[in-house]
Amino acid sequence: MEQTLDITKLWDRLASCPGVEAIALGGSRAAGNADEKSDYDVYVYVCGELTAGEREPILAAYCDRMEIDNRYWEREDNCRLKNGVDLDIIYRSLPDFERGLRWVVKEGNASNGYTTCMWHNLNTCRILYDRDGRLAALQQEYAVPYPKILKHNIIERNLKLLGGVLPSYDMQIKKARQRGDFVSVNHRTAAFLES
């Protein structure tokens, strides 16, 4: 019970920071299938800047290990709570997030992998705090069937990468094999299978 109370207080402290518009819980904890090894995946949506200097003292009260402002995938703080549970906090610009959703879902644009990950994250997250209801409004706006044009564009883009164009994965695998570069063969084969 204390773990839930402490973590709730952490969300409250983050929510009190200027510029924080919304906070959401994602991953296995939001989906209801967390186990004893599950971490917390938390998304903090901001308008403006929430600096590392502002975040660090808040997190220090709850965490015994912190890596502040990592940028491996997104802007994030990777921490270990004092109870031993890992915590990943991702900081996202709410306006940029909205633009990205529109670009994918409404405009049907595809990327190389991860095209719909933000949309899925929005639709499966549990909102913990929503200052003006903007995140909930986005959830409602984007709770739509999978757009046919998006499906078409993802398939078309990925089919080209599988073969038939100069930088396609099959050509990259062939070239790596000819060079005896088995690390590249493995890497490109994984990308091929991902597509």
Residue map of PLM features:
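Conserved NTP/Mg2+-binding pocket subregion across the NTase superfamily
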Residues: 64-177
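Short, hydrophobic/aromatic alpha-helical segments in well-folded domains
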Residues: 10, 171-172, 188
